[in-house]
Structure formats: structure tokens, C-alpha cells
Amino acid sequence: MTPQDFFENNGYWIESEPLFSSQDLAEYRQSMTDIMNHKYESGREPMAGRNWPERQDLQGMVQINNAWWAGGAIRRLSLNRRIGKIATQLLQVNGVCMWHDQLLYKPPAKSKTLSGNIGWHQDWNYWQVCDHADLITAWVALNDVNIQNGAMMIIPGSHRWGQAMEASERTLEMDKTASKVKIPRGEKWKIVHCELRAGAVSFHHAKTIHGSGPNHSDQPRLGLAIHMIADHVRYTSQGIYSHSNLKVCPRKEGDLFRGHQHPVIWGNETE
């Protein structure tokens, strides 16, 4: 079975061999540290996210939106052409553009707090300003990621379930949220843990249900989610939700997603 066939059937793919060297990873981690400490090589602050720019919950997940704005090594990683090429091949499209990225810092859970969790969800619920669901996420492990430190969990095949849950049903209580999912007849709720060595990358479809639990290790879990959009997808105002990208890069009905917020990562315009 080819990677494309596996992705089409399961809604995810894991590049198990690291794509990046130890030196690359050291640069990415340092860049992440700089951004979390409000040091931006480009001079531009990323968009506000969860528990950031003011970190009020030291045990809570830190999620920094559009971290690539800050420049430096994280920007280079977010626009990495090798990742873009794999994403293009998995979606079976002509090319992909940046949608947005998210730096993810999951601290060790020193109590039974849920604030380090990312509840079960489908990205597509929040991205319906797009006229097609041809979007994909590359999740880059910046250190080793395993079950103990809260590896992302995926429900294989759930990208074929349509809108299986409402955005309003998402909570940090994993079991409670799972009980709300509309599972089609004949399908099963099966969890796959995306355990990755540092430098390895997983990919998942915009409709694939995913989430992550607490970090029970003694070190933070570090990752970068690069959300990419197929180069043929256009803006529509028919979606239920708007999107924060539109605040910095407004669109007219039917516009392609291009420009400073949506550079081409892989495709004819980069070759």
C-alpha cells in the first residue's frame, strides 16, 4: 500500500524516519524558546493563542498561533519544502500553501489538571471559510514524543465520518467529548497514538478526529503543527465560523488563499 492509499483510507500518515538532523532540531528548539520568551528575529509577534502571550497557567498547554511570523528557524521549518511535497502527495493535489502554524508546548502535569490536554476535535470545524476540505496538518516532533508525554491520538478513518462532532462539544475531558461523537454504523472508535522520534513527522487530514492527553513525563513535550491548504481551495463566506487569518489577510468570495499569509510551500510557484 502506498502512503497515498494509506492516507486516503485512514486519514493520517506517519513519516517514522526523522526528516531533520540533531543540529536542525537544536536550532528549532532554540527558536521555539526565543519565541516563548518574546524574542522575534523578524520583529513581528505571532498571533495570540492558548495560554499565550501571557502564560497564566504553568501546567497548561501553550499554543502559539502563526509562530512563523517571528522568523528564524521556526519560520524555515514551517515553510519546509520537503514537508510541503509530502503533504501535496498525500492530498493528491498540485501544491499546498501555508494556512497557519501552531507551536505547541505541553508541560509536565504535576497534578490531575486537564489544562495540558487538547480535546478531541476535527480541524475542519474551524476552517469552513474554505470551499473544500483539502487541508492537511504536518505535526513535527521537536523532541521524542510517546504515550507517556502526551503523544497526539488519532481515530483512523474518522475523516470519512463527515462532521462527526460539533465544535461546541469539544472539552478537555477526553472521555466526555468522545461520548458525543457521531460514529457511523459499522465504524469503530479506535485510538492510534502517534509516537514519534525527534525530527519525525505525522500528517493528518482536516476531518480526522484527534487530540492529546496529559504529559506524565518530567520534561515538556515540544512540537510544531504546520497546517497547509491545497492550492486550489478558495474562500467562501458560507461557513459557520470565521477564521483569525481573515483579520490579517481579508478575502473576497471565491479568492484563492495566497499572499503574505498564505505563501506557496510546494507547487508550481516554488519550482
Model-derived features: where do they sit?
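Short helix-to-loop capping/linker segments positioned immediately adjacent to catalytic or ligand/cofactor-binding
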Residues: 86, 124-129, 140-143, 187-193, ...
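Short edge-strand/loop segments of extracellular domains
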Residues: 106-108, 155-162, 221, 227-233
